[in-house]
């Protein structure tokens, strides 16, 4: 199993759909015996440049450990989901579990059950 960092950007009108989308992606990873090491909902943020005349979008970060086949399935799901504006998948050498620098001084909206308090405290 390999480690990956995935960031995807969702259309702001579909922000309510993000938890359901994340749950679907978590299920795909779990079915292949993969692990989610970090899952962060960065919320709505300003885009660096407009995409289809949209200036804000909903960001989600996932650090996972799974097979390349599952990553391919996830990328296909991103590609065919009209709500996902952009996505980026990077292969990493090690699992990353600490809070990301994008969160800054904000509290993390950590979507992993049970780990939210621990991740914010560290």
From Swiss-Prot:
Biological process (GO), any one: translation
A Pfam family assignment: Ribosomal_S6
Alphabetical UniProt keywords: Ribonucleoprotein, Ribosomal protein, RNA-binding, rRNA-binding
Signal peptide (from-to): none
GO molecular function, one term: structural constituent of ribosome
Gene Ontology CC terms: cytosolic small ribosomal subunit
Family annotation (InterPro entries): Ribosomal_bS6, Ribosomal_bS6_CS, Ribosomal_bS6_sf, Ribosomal_S6_plastid/chlpt, Transl_elong_EF1B/ribsomal_bS6
Keyword RNA-binding appears in the UniProt entry: yes
Top-rank taxon: Bacteria
Gene3D superfamilies, alphabetized: 3.30.70.60
Family: Belongs to the bacterial ribosomal protein bS6 family.
Function summary: Binds together with bS18 to 16S ribosomal RNA.
Protein known as: Small ribosomal subunit protein bS6
Encoding gene (name): rpsF
